[in-house]
């Protein structure tokens, strides 16, 4: 995530002693449970500050669900706390949302009380100092404006809009019919306050417009809400199995990315995959289909720049067909696409002998792409799990 001043924010979990350049972070040597780190770097990669949070409860697994930066440089962090303490304040075990100042001081902590499980999967700044939270839950939760109930034995998707003080403006919940599910995996907000959500559903679901129905285990969807949370439009990639795990917005464009198998039609053109492949689909702000691309790679994260160009990151097994010259060895890729037709402007590939993962991408005001992810280590056969990965930050010129 990139702040307005070009600084780079990152949040992750760690299981080994860690030093990001400012000295060793706190580490509980008697626990193999995940720790959590949030850090801020300068545009040149110099550490400004970092917080390492140690687990106090082995029964709750720490998790990073989302990271966002508002226009003032405040940092919003969402996920699951394992009984963390930051400064003199506690983050009780369970789902949490916290706001940190640009200097890293903890300012606010918000919880969503209830029963069952809740996963925060994505955050997006709303342009007014607040944040929009997306995820899924089971059981019952109080989102601040109402108590929401997921059908017994099912997971339902939720979106909550909060102001800069962490108070709820509105919340929305979507549940599937019968034995289905709905999960929200990504969220973005445009300059007019419109909220865009992507994820997957099974069975049948009504987001506020015509009902969507699938016979697949999971089918990708995208939807738009007004600034007040009213349904504007909803779409799915009918005929496919997969998840829309990324979304980004530009001038009159909504870009949706993820992975799929099966076949879908976009503007009358078929996109077919017998195994898991990546896709990017572009809509205009009214939900009209503009273009789509599918390719032999994952589509992990999306970001747009001031020109509306789309930056896409993921991993591939050597069959990348986004426009890389020559045979591209398996590894990571970063691609920039034209917003009008999806044509590749440039593609960079980075080979790796292990299985790399690109987790997020952002573009700063200068057009630099910043990618965060993880690299798998090579272990001897029989090494027990969990097997730690090494995190990385990568900054590319425009």
Where are these regions (language model features)?
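A sequence-level/structural motif corresponding to short, flexible coil/turn segments enriched
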Residues: 1-398
């Amino acid at each position: 995530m990139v702040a307005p001043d070009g600084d780079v924010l990152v949040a992750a979990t760690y299981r080994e002693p860690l030093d990001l350049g400012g000295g060793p972070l706190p580490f509980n040597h008697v626990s193999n449970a995940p720790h959590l780190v949030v850090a801020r770097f300068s545009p040149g990669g110099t550490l400004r500050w970092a917080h390492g949070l140690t687990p106090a409860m082995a029964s709750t697994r720490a998790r990073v669900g989302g990271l966002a930066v508002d226009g003032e440089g405040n940092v919003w962090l969402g996920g699951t706390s394992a009984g963390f303490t930051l400064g003199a304040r506690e983050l009780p075990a369970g789902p949490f949302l916290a706001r940190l100042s640009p200097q890293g001081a903890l300012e606010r902590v918000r919880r969503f009380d209830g029963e069952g499980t809740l996963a925060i999967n994505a955050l997006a700044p709303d342009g007014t100092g607040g944040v929009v939270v997306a995820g899924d839950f089971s059981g019952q939760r109080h989102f601040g404006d109402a108590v929401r109930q997921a059908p017994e034995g099912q997971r339902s998707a939720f979106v909550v809009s909060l102001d800069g003080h962490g108070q709820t403006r509105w919340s929305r919940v979507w549940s599937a019919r019968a034995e289905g599910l709905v999960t929200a995996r990504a969220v973005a907000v445009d300059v007019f306050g419109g909220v865009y959500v992507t994820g997957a559903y099974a069975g049948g679901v009504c987001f506020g417009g015509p009902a969507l129905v699938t016979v697949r285990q999971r089918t990708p969807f995208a939807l738009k809400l007004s600034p007040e949370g009213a349904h504007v439009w909803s779409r799915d990639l009918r005929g496919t199995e997969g998840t829309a795990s990324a979304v980004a917005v530009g001038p009159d464009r909504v870009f949706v990315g993820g992975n799929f198998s099966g076949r879908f039609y976009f503007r009358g053109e078929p996109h077919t995959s017998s195994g898991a492949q990546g896709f990017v689909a572009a809509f205009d702000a009214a939900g009209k289909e503009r273009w789509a691309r599918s390719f032999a790679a994952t589509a992990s994260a999306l970001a747009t720049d001031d020109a509306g160009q789309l930056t896409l990151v993921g991993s591939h097994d050597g069959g990348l067909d986004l426009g890389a010259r020559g045979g591209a060895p398996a590894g990571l890729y970063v691609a920039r696409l034209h917003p009008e037709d999806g044509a590749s402007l440039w593609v960079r590939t980075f080979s790796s002998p292990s299985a790399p993962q690109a987790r997020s991408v952002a573009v700063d005001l200068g057009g630099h792409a910043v990618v965060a992810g993880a690299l798998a280590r090579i272990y001897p056969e029989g090494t027990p799990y969990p097997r730690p990965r090494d995190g990385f930050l990568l900054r590319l010129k425009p």
